[in-house]
């Protein structure tokens, strides 16, 4: 969980450590993205954005059942807004783990990902 990870960083010390935040795993641990607000940008070194299928819940979500950002049930606009509010300027990695191709070609898949992120203002 976010709380456990922050406790570990606090115990070890932040030198050389950073936090990778992930929209999917925030959901599976029932953590609102607003919990990131007090952290600021310095601690967050990388961010993943992905969505969960609409038929899943936080309790039933599996890694292989992700969909394009904005195509599922996660409050991704809120997640993006929080990252912007804390001044996060690093990479935002789209991590769509699914057995279903995101497009007929790799170029189409990349374009579909780009369009889904643009709709979220990324």
Question: How would you label these PLM feature ranges?
Answer:
Residues 2-21, 25-122:
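Histidine-acidic metal/acid-base catalytic patches
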């Amino acid at each position: 969980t976010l709380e456990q990870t922050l406790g570990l960083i606090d115990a070890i010390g932040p030198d050389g450590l950073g936090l990778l935040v992930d929209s999917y795993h925030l959901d599976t641990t029932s953590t609102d993205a607003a919990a990131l607000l007090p952290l600021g940008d310095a601690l967050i070194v990388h961010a993943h954005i992905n969505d969960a299928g609409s038929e899943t819940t936080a309790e039933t979500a599996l890694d292989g059942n992700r969909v394009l950002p904005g195509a599922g049930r996660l409050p991704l606009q809120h997640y993006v807004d929080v990252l912007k509010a804390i001044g996060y300027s690093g990479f935002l990695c789209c991590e769509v783990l699914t057995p279903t191709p995101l497009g007929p070609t790799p170029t189409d898949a990349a374009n579909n990902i780009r369009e889904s992120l643009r709709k979220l203002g990324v």
